[in-house]
């Protein structure tokens, strides 16, 4: 069974090394400008500040299997957006990929995030393998974000139309 280990803001320095390695090795950020941004004080300061706020808090977690860290994720739950859980990062360390590990990690994340108020999930992804993975979990395409990256959603509540009550 996959367990979740939440990372406190004070523990972020050790996490950042794994994070940038994932972003570069998996081809998420291919250019030097992006690498500079994601390793810089501005980005990291924003994440840490969001981890400390009371509303719409940012979470950074490790996935554990038999006590060993096998992956990580970061996400934010937006209470005012009907419990939207926006997944910023999600990855299984390369040595543990395959055999449904990613699926089990997402299931663990969904249980953990639900306990924190998550109702539905949204993320952006454009890598072909990642898109296949998220679609295999039931995510559906839902337009693009402000950077023109494809958005995917799962479990989004249908909007209530008040005109039905007239």
Model-inferred region functions:
Residues 2-3:
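Extreme N-terminal starter segment of soluble prokaryotic enzymes
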Residues 6-83, 88, 93, 112, ...:
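Acetyl-CoA-dependent GNAT
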Residues 78-80, 95, 128, 157:
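Short coil/turn motifs at secondary-structure junctions
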Residues 86, 117-119, 138:
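Short loop/turn motifs at secondary-structure junctions
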Residues 92, 98-111, 136:
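Conserved acetyl-CoA-binding loop-helix of GNAT-fold acetyltransferases
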Residues 103, 126-144, 148-150:
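Conserved active-site alpha-helix within GNAT-family acetyltransferase domains
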Residues 113-126:
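Conserved GNAT acetyl-CoA-binding A-motif
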Residues 140-166:
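Terminal substrate-recognition subdomain of acyl/acetyltransferases
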């Amino acid at each position: 069974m996959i367990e979740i280990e939440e990372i406190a803001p004070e523990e972020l320095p050790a996490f950042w090394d794994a994070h940038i390695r994932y972003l570069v090795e998996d081809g998420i950020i291919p250019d030097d400008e992006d690498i500079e941004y994601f390793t810089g004080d501005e980005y990291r300061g924003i994440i840490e500040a969001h981890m400390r706020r009371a509303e719409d808090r940012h979470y950074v977690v490790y996935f554990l299997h038999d006590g060993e860290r096998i992956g990580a994720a970061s996400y934010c739950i937006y209470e005012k957006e009907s419990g939207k859980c926006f997944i910023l990062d999600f990855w299984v360390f390369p040595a543990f990929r395959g055999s449904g590990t990613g699926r089990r990690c997402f299931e663990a994340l969904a249980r953990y995030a639900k306990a924190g108020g998550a109702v539905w999930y949204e993320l952006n992804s454009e890598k072909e393998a990642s898109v296949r993975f998220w679609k295999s979990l039931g995510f559906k395409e839902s337009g693009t974000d402000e950077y023109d990256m494809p958005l995917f959603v799962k479990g989004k509540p249908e909007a209530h139309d008040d005109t039905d009550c007239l």
